[in-house]
A protein has these predicted regions:
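Cytoplasmic helix-loop-helix junction between adjacent transmembrane helices
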Residues: 1-17
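Intracellular juxtamembrane helix-capping segments at the cytosolic ends
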Residues: 1-3, 194-207
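Helix-loop-helix hairpin linking two adjacent transmembrane segments in secondary transporters
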Residues: 14-64
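Flexible cytoplasmic inter-helical loops of multi-pass small-molecule transporters
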Residues: 44, 57-82, 270-273
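Extracytoplasmic gate region of multi-pass secondary transporters
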Residues: 90-134, 140
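Helix-to-loop junctions at the C-terminal end of transmembrane segments
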Residues: 143-154, 237-238
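Structural signature of the two symmetry-related core transmembrane helices
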Residues: 157-171
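A late C-terminal transmembrane helix in Major Facilitator Superfamily
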Residues: 209-239
């Protein structure tokens, strides 16, 4: 509704708020929670209340828009490309694999990067939180950049370059020195985080009459696979080591190669017009 035709950009702007909040978490933990204790977490409830009030206002606005749209209901939107039902399901399965490869790796980074740095380089907890902020901040920037590039160059290519392109940097990270580890983490965050908005918009282009369902499924997979990945790597770390789980997780972006099997929706859409 609010994208103005730039769907990937609109989706990335929506996501960058959440990613930006995640990035600020380690900084606030280092500057507020660590020196003042766990009770200081309650101070952040003020921000949550402001967010709730803002969402109530937006919800009222959206309700009016829905009522207006119902009165002026248009024909059911048609897919940008015409694929058989079986092919659509196959493409959606590929997108699920890509979501898995991305968020399985990110779950390891977001949950255990600080422990990895403390264990391998013996830095302080506070310093490790600043390093995690660098990774998450780069992820927020990458999310926004991915939306811009997806609208300009095509979502398939952004998805492909984002996940598979992060693989060499992820594979080098467990073996790097401290300085290079942080630099590689920033590059991985920038690159791998640029894919999700393009994945969601790509999926909704396949089934434009089920935007709510498709968005819900992929956002659910994002959180669900992240949680499963975090639990899995925690279990594996207890039986091996933190350094070992980073070695294992570094191979997951290689699954990005399956993005080459995706049809180029934007190119076909233009040829059909």
């Amino acid at each position: 509704m609010a994208s103005g035709g730039k769907k990937s950009l609109a989706q990335s702007i929506f996501q960058v708020g959440g990613n930006g909040g995640n990035a600020l978490g380690p900084i606030l933990a280092a500057l507020v929670v660590q020196p003042f204790g766990q009770r200081s977490i309650g101070w952040f409830s003020i921000v949550a209340v402001i967010a709730i009030l803002t969402m109530l206002h937006i919800g009222s606005w959206y309700k009016r828009r829905l009522l207006n749209a119902t009165l002026h209901k248009k024909a059911t939107p048609q897919p940008f490309i015409h694929l058989s039902r079986r092919r659509v399901h196959w493409v959606l399965a590929i997108l699920v694999v890509l979501i898995f490869s991305k968020y399985f790796y990110l779950s390891c980074m977001t949950s255990y990067f600080t422990f990895f740095l403390i264990d391998k380089f013996h830095i302080s907890v506070q310093a490790s939180q600043f390093c995690l902020f660098a990774f998450l901040g780069a992820s927020a920037i990458g999310t926004l950049g991915g939306g811009l590039l997806g609208d300009r160059f095509g979502r398939k290519y952004v998805i492909w370059a984002s996940i598979l392109g992060a693989a060499p940097f992820a594979l080098m990270l467990p073996f790097a020195s401290f300085g290079w580890t942080i630099a590689l983490a920033v590059v991985v965050g920038l690159v791998i985080s640029s894919a999700f908005s393009s994945i969601v918009v790509y999926a909704t282009d396949l089934m434009p009459d089920k935007i709510g369902m498709i968005s819900g499924v992929f956002f659910g997979l994002m959180f669900g696979l992240g949680g499963v990945g975090s639990a899995f790597f925690g279990w594996l770390a207890d039986r091996t080591s933190v350094e070992y789980i980073f070695l294992v997780s570094s191979f997951s972006p290689l699954l990005g190669i399956v993005a080459g099997l995706l049809p180029n929706t934007q190119k076909k859409a233009v040829s059909q017009q």
